[in-house]
Amino acid sequence: MRKLAGFFAALAALALAFRFGGGAQDVSELVPVQALVIDAQNGEITVTADTQDVGRGGSLDAALSDLRAGCAGTLFTQTAEHVVLTQKAWFLMPQVCVSAQLRPAAKLYRAVGQEITAERALSFLQAHPGELTLSRARAALLENKEVQAAVLVKTGGGFRLGG
């Protein structure tokens, strides 16, 4: 009787493991994101990753979900170190700061001027990171303080950070 109970317990554990994603996953399918650029135009939110993947939607969460769904592998937005909001998308900053799909320790930037791609901005931002994180921006919002994100400006040969 004990052996039979043990067999059914093992069978149930195996079934649960496969039911809830306990199966093996190929590591080459994992796509960690390091930088995201968020833009808004004509009521549509566009999120572009440094991996060249793009997501679109009517809300920030919908665009981030579309970004993950459109990727050939398993895309992780929670690994993003840098989040850049364009001038047109700055109104999304409070949503970005509280999004469960983004890493609270990610640095926050506001882009002005020309179009900025996540892929091109990544190497600059890694060498010259800003100081404001999403969690600090959220704290400032909760205290009714103005959020002062570093301003990312595209120059003729690269980028520049301003205050």
Which sequence ranges carry the predicted segments?
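Membrane-proximal alpha-helical signals and transmembrane carboxylates
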Residues: 1-163
